[in-house]
Amino acid sequence: MPRHADLMERARRVIPGGMYGHQSTARLPASFPQFFSRAEGARMWDADGREFIDYMCGYGPNLFGYGFAKVEAAVDAQRALGDSMTGPGPVMVELAEAMVATVAHADWAMFCKNGTDATSMALLVARAHRGRRKIVLARDTYHGAAAWSTPRPGGVLPEDRAHLIYCRYNDPQSLEDAVREAGDDLAGICVTPFRHETFRHQHLPELEFARLARELCDRHDALLILDEVRAGFRLARDCSWHDLGVEPDLSCWGKAIANGHPLSALLGSERAREAAQKPYLTGSFWFSAVPMAAAVATLKEIRESDYLERTIRTGTALRDGLQQQAASHGFSLRQTGPVQMPQILFEEDDDFRLGYAWVEGALKRGIYLHPFHNMFICAALTEADVRETLEKTDLAFADLRRDAPGLQGPPPQIAATVAAMAGDRR
């Protein structure tokens, strides 16, 4: 029995469903491996030793490449000194200083473990700011796995979302209506830098929407929260809205800030400092020194290297190449979002049968793409990697052209999701 099959059989006995959460392969094509034995740079190897060029980057944490030497050297040095001690190491102050120096709106920093920690902390701080309850969010936007945001209904009570009001992303009138509904009880507006939901096309922020969110928070003495967990430091060396001239009061960070080591952060302006001291915010491993050392080294590389320009260059080459290939095989791709975080969907594929078959064709040739989640470009991805990818995806397109008439859809593992969407991928 292949090692992966054995692992899956054992996992089903001791882990609910065999795996859970966003890294579960339950909704992916059956050939996608669940377990990986190692990773280096832009590549990873599954439990049976198959090698892949990885376009998921661990769902975002891998910014500079798996096992990036400068980060791992900092990790090794700090581990030799201590990690989860009775109090934090001096590196916590160093990291807070580095975050404040890097992100324009930030005057202070607090650290935690996951994106859900950071976004949940942000809501607590916003509510503590003026003792109000209502938070305005964009409908269907993912801000983490807490009960107030998780996309799955199991165990979630109406009370968990009783004080959330929803608007449509990039719709100024909808945002104004939601704020009006909140009235004098508005605590904050929480949005992502751009719209990046699964199964849907991505949408960059419209300037009018971003500016209005800032203006409404100022007008109502509420806090603007920017959820940078997924996009942070992939679009800019600052907050993603900095170039729009819009600064939040609070920003939530995770994934890439420590290049794969477990750390997230809540950054805030002076205006929110007092409110940040009111809730009780803590966790057993929030103050671990090793991930903080990784983050200090990561931030140094963010400030000093050309990583951003490189990811834009390789991301653009991939996007252009795929578009040409799709057209040459008679398909139409819609690639949306920043090239560093591409979402790739087929135009004529409301039930995702084409996308599923295409990524499976790429996978069997050593290219790990995703059929419904946005992907990530890491700085370790080279132009040679992109050329190799395009050689393999061209073959996957050829297979798809041959097999498309006989494909049955939607794939059963996502049939309910497809039915609920009713073809709407906006």
Per-region residue spans from a language model:
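Conserved N-terminal phosphate-binding loop of PLP-dependent enzymes in the Aspartate aminotransferase
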Residues: M1-R426
